[in-house]
Amino acid sequence: MGGSKPLRMLGGATLLRHACDWATARSDHVALAVREAGQLFDESLPLLIDRHTGIGPISALASAFDFAQATKREHVLVIGCDQPFLPNNLVARLSAAIGDGGAAMPTSLGREQPLATLWRADRGALAEYLAKGGQSLKGFAHRVNAVTVEWETEPGCDPFFNINDPMALEEAERRFRRTRR
């Protein structure tokens, strides 16, 4: 998309603001994972700086697992800032499904959604996966035997819609206006 995706505007607020608002409405333990310290976007949340660079979103998961240990949490939910329509019942449904599993991952329209997954904060399993060269969130989810949770969708209303380009941002803006009426 070019530029800083978290700072792109949707419905009068940044994508990051939408994600932070969604998360803080569901938990009192929310942190913001960033690649480097200079990416300070929201000083009201704890900032987690990626320890592993150049490996993508799984680095944020490692930071989240560290945060979970520090705050004595068994699970973490990692979301991307580019999914502004996450379902309100995401945490409840994934929490009900995870059981003793390593993760509960939603699926929608036949696609797994690793950036909206509830993870058991198993730092050892993640360290082992990374040491063997693993870098895929989906791959790690399969490694820890993630339970999948199917999400029903309505036409044109994928709750895991992902904004990856300017056209998707325009589509999200149209959808945002429709849903906020």
Give the location of each predicted region:
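Nucleotide and nucleotide-moiety/phosphate-recognizing core
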Residues: 1-134, 139-159, 166-180
